[in-house]
Amino acid sequence: MIKARDEEFVATLKELNPDIIVVVAFGQILPKSILDIPKFGCINVHVSLLPKYRGAAPINWVIINGEEKTGVTTMYMDEGLDTGDMILTEEFDLDDEITAGELHDKMKDRGADVLIETLKQIEKGTAHRIPQ
């Protein structure tokens, strides 16, 4: 397993000099030494309507709490846990009978679409930074 704070990993990323880093379900908070590498930032795809359900298992919490709506959010990463400025959010209604597995699959598809649009906006210089 890759450790985000591993010095060798950070050095490899610096050598690669990426323009942007995209993280999906990584499960680790990126240190400032990584966040500062890409010129267009580090982007996270989070499967909730931030700021609600930051952190782990947002799909499960949405179902446990009986939410009627949920969604996918892209955000610029910062040193906090899902606290960075939001870029795009897509909201949708939930079926009362949806399972975590079904919602995961729906989020995967929606998340890919939102990520593609986010990257297009960043490339054009039109991406917004919406504080949480």
What are the residue ranges of the model-derived segments?
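One-carbon transfer enzymes
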Residues: 1-132
